[in-house]
Amino acid sequence: MTQFIEGKWTAGLGHEVTSINPANQEVIWNSKTATPEQVNTAVDAARNAQFDWFMLGFEARLAIVEAYRDQLEANKAEMAEVIAQETGKPQWETATEAGAMIGKIGLSVAAFHKRTGTSENDTPAGRAVLRHKPHGVVAVFGPYNFPGHLPNGHIVPALLAGNTVVFKPSELTPKVAELMLKLWEKAGLPAGVINLVQGEVETGKALASHPQIDGLFFTGSSRTGHILHQQYAGDPGKILALEMGGNNPLIIKGVEDTKAAVHDIIQSAYISSGQRCTCARRLYVEKGAAGDALLEQLAVAVNNIQVGAWNAQPQPFMGSMISETAAKGMVEAQRNLVNLGATPMVELTHLEAGTGLVSPGLIDVTDVIELPDEEYFGPLLQVVRYSDFDEAIKLANATRYGLSAGILADSREDYDYFLARIRAGIVNWNKQITGASGAAPFGGVGASGNHRASAFYAADYCAYPVASVEADAVSLPAKLSPGLSI
């Protein structure tokens, strides 16, 4: 009974699917997918519930959202454990994800008031009022890398604005989604306000193409995001918010504390086994003795990164990738780069057959003439040596993506020069580029998104503005327009 439609748990009527722990192949979830007919029922349920949900008013909606926050707080250990088992991420990391889900509530409320809400100004003839209204029924497509936090960042602001939701999580992390919906149910959410449809491509296509949804919020691959963008191109009445990852650059220039630089590089490239959309994929290091020394330190540190199962003790820095298929894909990506002329500095290896466990890789691609502009979604960092700062920035910008970028540099002047020229939605200085503030927008340009930044700006795509000029009574103006006689 793993579909949640119209406030009731029901079995899927499609084909059987399982979710496995990628670190040990243990089956942790088993069910059947939602059929297109069940997706249709879910959308109908959301449509039928939407106006009443909106008319409850903000304070009543907020009370239910805050009850959900309380449920998350009470069940954060279970949430962290389920995320760890299903994604393979170590427990220390999934505990931070569960905490981020709780913190998202307060941030979303603040964003609602600051970015949307209601404002009023007096005018000579009455008053001008700005309000925001929900789009209606929105679809939320969740990713596997942050299966709780990222869909939560769409769902919470959507509900606060008065929308209802049909949630289609990644087929790789269905158990996390199921737990989320159980907590919403305990929070007293009215029937139909959130509907959960579990499934694979067929389920996703049925939801994305449904004529009765008013918007779709997507986090995932650039390939799928571009398909959705093309699909929605002729339908301007529907809001589409896309976050699609990046081929993110990190430049090192004139850093005295090389140990700190190595730490920030590792946190940028290898956290979450490289499965964050903001992870550094390309590292630009100056040619010369200083750059050589930095890379020697980095190679030693990368070799020393501890990799293990989600529950290993002592806890590893890197857990499993999401699947054995993903792990094999990273080995193949490394092989392709070597065939193009790259030189491994630390070889990425598949540690155990049947699992997603890989060791982190570091590879020098300076001699690759045409470096593929690909997001290799795993722990493989490509090194490019440079001799000129302008050259490094030009190479950093040589991507169709534009999500995150960063520079480690002791000089503020170097940072300002970089900031003015780099093309990315998240630009950090002397901090890991996987670090982003929840009180700021999150999104990129180019193939990384469609100018619908999430996080603090998610409120913007969850509602549309309604501008009104109002007066308490109909009245004649003090002076009629020329040519009128009443």
Swiss-Prot record:
One of its GO terms (molecular function) is succinylglutamate-semialdehyde dehydrogenase activity. Belongs to the aldehyde dehydrogenase family. AstD subfamily. The gene is astD. It is an enzyme of class 1 (oxidoreductase). Keywords: Arginine metabolism, NAD, Oxidoreductase. The active site is at 243, 277. It catalyses: N-succinyl-L-glutamate 5-semialdehyde + NAD(+) + H2O = N-succinyl-L-glutamate + NADH + 2 H(+). Pfam families: Aldedh. Its EC number is 1.2.1.71. GO terms for biological process: arginine catabolic process to glutamate; arginine catabolic process to succinate. It comes from the Bacteria. Catalyzes the NAD-dependent reduction of succinylglutamate semialdehyde into succinylglutamate. InterPro entries: Ald_DH/histidinol_DH (IPR016161), Ald_DH_C (IPR016163), Ald_DH_CS_CYS (IPR016160), Ald_DH_CS_GLU (IPR029510), Ald_DH_N (IPR016162), Aldehyde_DH_dom (IPR015590), SuccinylGlu_semiald_DH_AstD (IPR017649). PANTHER family: ALDEHYDE DEHYDROGENASE-RELATED. Gene3D superfamilies: Aldehyde Dehydrogenase, Chain A, domain 1, Aldehyde Dehydrogenase, Chain A, domain 2. Pathway: Amino-acid degradation; L-arginine degradation via AST pathway; L-glutamate and succinate from L-arginine: step 4/5. This is N-succinylglutamate 5-semialdehyde dehydrogenase. NAD(+) binds at residues 220-225.
